[in-house]
Amino acid sequence: MKVAKVFTTGRSQAVRIPKAFQFDTKEVIIQRFGNGILLIPKNSDWQGFLEALNEFEPDFKIEREPQIEQVREDFL
């Protein structure tokens, strides 16, 4: 796992992104997840997914019936 440096520039906090992780774009979407953040290129296929995540309530849980264990034969 790589480590990036966090620093302050003016009134903003910034992260020095290692070369292997640099973006090929001028803008990114930023999304907070718990105590972490996710950066995705602005013009990415993930943009719609991230927008959809914002529609869920913070305490959203999927309720479902417990799975019944399946008995299967060995594959080989």
Swiss-Prot record:
<feature type="domain" description="SpoVT-AbrB">
    <location>
        <begin position="4"/>
        <end position="44"/>
    </location>
</feature>
<dbReference type="Pfam" id="PF04014">
    <property type="entry name" value="MazE_antitoxin"/>
</dbReference>
<protein>
    <recommendedName>
        <fullName>Virulence-associated protein B</fullName>
    </recommendedName>
</protein>
<dbReference type="GO" id="GO:0003677">
    <property type="term" value="F:DNA binding"/>
</dbReference>
<comment type="similarity">
    <text>Belongs to the VapB family.</text>
</comment>
<dbReference type="InterPro" id="IPR051734">
    <property type="entry name" value="VapB_TA_antitoxins"/>
</dbReference>
<dbReference type="InterPro" id="IPR047976">
    <property type="entry name" value="Anti_VapB2-like"/>
</dbReference>
<dbReference type="InterPro" id="IPR037914">
    <property type="entry name" value="SpoVT-AbrB_sf"/>
</dbReference>
<keyword id="KW-0843">Virulence</keyword>
<dbReference type="InterPro" id="IPR007159">
    <property type="entry name" value="SpoVT-AbrB_dom"/>
</dbReference>
<keyword id="KW-0238">DNA-binding</keyword>
